[in-house]
Amino acid sequence: MAMTTETVWAALDALLDYAKNCGLLHPLDETFARNTLLSELRLESYEKQEQHFDFPECLNLLCDYAAQQGMIADTIAERDLFDTKLMGFLTPRPSEVVREFRSRYTQSPKAATDYFYNLSQDCNYIRRDRIAKDERWTAETKYGKLEISINLSKPEKDPRDIAAAKLKKASGYPKCLLCPENVGYAGTISHPARQNLRVMPVMVNGQLWGFQYSPYVYYNEHCIVMNARHTPMVIDRGVFDKLFSFVEQFPHYFLGSNADLPIVGGSILSHEHFQGGHHTFPMEKAEKEFGFEVPGFDDVDCCVVRYPMTVLRLNSQNKDHLCDLAGRILARWRAYSDPAAMIFAETDGEPHNTITPIARMREGRHELDLVLRNNLTTKEHPMGLYHPHEELHHIKKENIGLIEVMGLAVLPGRLKKEMADLREALLNGENLRENEELSKHADWADAFMARHPEFNAENAEAIIQYEIGQVFAQVLECAGVYKCTESGRAALKRFLTEVQNG
């Protein structure tokens, strides 16, 4: 049924009311904004309506109208391009956002980030309605509580959009999703629209960088801090100074970097960037397992953390000393081989050792977690020896990047349906091996059903969630270069001796 013009006007009114109520739009700019939107919707007249719609329903109605009128195809990608364009008209200009952020920063860094985070949600860059679909829980493991999420906020691609994207030639502008040229970019079928993106300029160690929020918000105030230049990821001594340069300006945030090698690195290695935010991860809560001292660095507290991945924690009031020691650890690790522990610095000229660093301020002191990583592949483990092993791929087979390293699993959306179906199949006593969708979970389900004779309709979901948590702990154990065993700790101490000897 075709939408009436009155409904479109009402949806338009609702969108403008929303923008005024959350401070995106100044009342003096309302008529200007309405006329801009009317022009975009190819409407030549307007009458005020009584009918009211909430946000984002009003925005969805305007997309419905555009699709009915043939302005856009009714696909997720085309609707996203269109609704982002509309929100772009209502989002304050970059200079206004920067001015407001800096004004609030004089009150406190937190006041500034609160403003910027709320703006990024209000202007629909972060789509609250999609983020709300993500499933989250915590699971108790032998390493303490780990955090689990099933990522449902990234919509599945429409086959029509995939087909259209194949026909579109890449323009090479912007070079990637992290380049500052994305601000205000209209987007294409294969590159998201960014008219409502705002990036805060920040100085990081004397260089111009940008600071924005991730549209997917895997955790509270999930931000991305990226070099203003399109330059590749590199983990070197300078990275530690850069991380602290940012967290000193925003001491309520942590900031970490993905590693700079494939398999153990992030998904974008072509543009230097860090990820941070206002969230306390399981790794940060993990306690000291044992301390160690490094001669010449008496003012740096060093310990190994009780955690499935290999974490060296450095804490000091002297940032320069701490970063110097981190630089030494990185240099030693890059060059370190211990064949007995299956650690090779390189094979056939390909380097394997790197680090995932995470910086934070803790009670006024500088703290740096160095997670030792290695991307060696073997015949038995072609995707990576220190990567989720094949028997865990039914839950998680993707790379273990910074967010997972810190103790938050980002699991694929397919698991929501698979786990609901698994619950029903187990309660009905079905043979999982005869079920095409669920057969990959059969060995795992057999094992945990043996541990849970109490499994019933009331507790089934809680047991499955708990057991997913145990799988995630195993995933992190796989990614840990030194295992939490006697032989693993002995091998780790051999490396620490290397560090201590300078």
Give residue spans per PLM region.
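Helical scaffold of the NTase/Pol beta-like nucleotidyltransferase catalytic core
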Residues: 196-198, 228-255
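Active-site microenvironments that recognize anionic phosphate/pyrophosphate groups
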Residues: 1-225, 229-232, 306-308, 322-326, ...
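Catalytic or ion-translocation cores adjacent to nucleophile or general acid/base/metal-coordination motifs
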Residues: 238, 247-270, 276-330, 334-337
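Short secondary-structure boundary/capping segments
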Residues: 165, 271-272
